[in-house]
Design a protein with these regions (language model features):
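Extracellular/virion structural assembly segments
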Residues: 120-284
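Preference for solvent-exposed, low-hydrophobicity sequence contexts
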Residues: 1-143
Length: 284
């Protein structure tokens, strides 16, 4: 069995030993996905059958810390969806999982949906004030993958990602179109833009998940209580020396563009081309 098709922030594998911390260059270091207690980030993956069992395991001991909580997850939005001959296991994450795990710590999921699937490590954290939240979705339609599909439009599915970061100093850019005549520049149009930036250090599986952000038509970024509706999103990945983490610089624009069409002057009082003020070229 190969890894299931999964490009969610909470990635799944066919063997928990494929988690990022077990890679040779990670040396056991855990770079978990951050969530609020009782909240598991929305995810979806291609599976071979309907879901029947869900367990939560401790990342410290790899032992189960819950009984089968599949019904609790179903109440919170877990279900199987059939699309284009694929069986997709969706978790919308729209309701909290109260009573499943009520305290901070690092955990991972063990799910049986035709076969066994194992999630990446996630961290329940009571304090996410220093986190930046990225929510992205695409109501216009689904995304196609080789041997899979990302279901978005038909299920109102939203990805949610919390990152240890905050918005840095913005950049200001200007675009200008001008015509030069007789040594003078005549401005035809000017555009001023403000671009926001942030930097975060994350493992490869989160870099994979963030590829989807740019493709989605709807992108909301929240930092320190302020929410921005991004109209563009770009990311640049710089792998660190050890190799298991990347410094990712992200930038996005919002609809704050200022435009000057230039050159047009409204003559409120009218005028005449030769100043004789008869009826030949009177302008109202």
């Amino acid at each position: 069995m190969a890894n299931p098709i999964c490009i969610s922030p909470l990635k799944f594998y066919d063997d928990f030993h494929k988690q990022n911390r077990y890679r040779s260059f990670a040396y056991g270091y855990v770079a978990p996905l951050i969530t609020n207690p009782n909240v598991v980030s929305p995810f979806q993956l291609i599976v071979s059958g309907n879901v029947s069992e869900v367990y939560v395991r401790s990342a410290n001991t790899n032992k189960r810390v819950t009984d089968n909580v599949v019904e609790r997850f179903k109440d919170a939005g877990l279900r199987n969806v059939s699309k284009n001959s694929y069986n997709i296991l969706l978790f919308l994450g729209i309701f909290p999982l109260s009573g499943v795990i009520d305290y901070e710590g690092q955990y991972w999921l063990e799910i049986h949906s035709g076969e066994w699937y194992y999630s990446e490590v996630f961290c329940f954290d009571n304090n996410i004030d220093d986190c930046l939240k990225v929510e992205y979705w695409n109501p216009e339609g689904d995304f196609a993958l080789k041997n899979g599909i990302i279901v978005l439009g038909s299920e109102n599915f939203h990805f949610i990602l919390l990152l240890k970061s905050e918005l840095g100093k913005p950049e200001y850019s200007f675009e200008e179109e001008a015509t030069k005549r007789l040594g003078y520049s005549f401005i035809e149009s000017q555009v001023s833009k403000k671009t926001y930036k942030f930097n975060t250090v994350i493992p490869e599986y989160l870099c994979d998940a963030m590829r989807i952000i740019r493709l989605c038509s709807q992108k909301k970024i929240t930092c320190k209580g302020e929410t921005y509706d991004a109209i563009t999103f770009n990311m640049e990945v710089d792998w660190q020396e050890q190799g298991d983490l990347a410094s990712v610089t992200c930038e996005f624009d919002v609809d704050n563009i200022i435009t000057n069409l230039g050159g047009f002057k409204h003559e409120a009082l009218g005028g005449d081309f030769n100043n004789d003020y008869n009826n030949d070229y009177d302008i109202e």
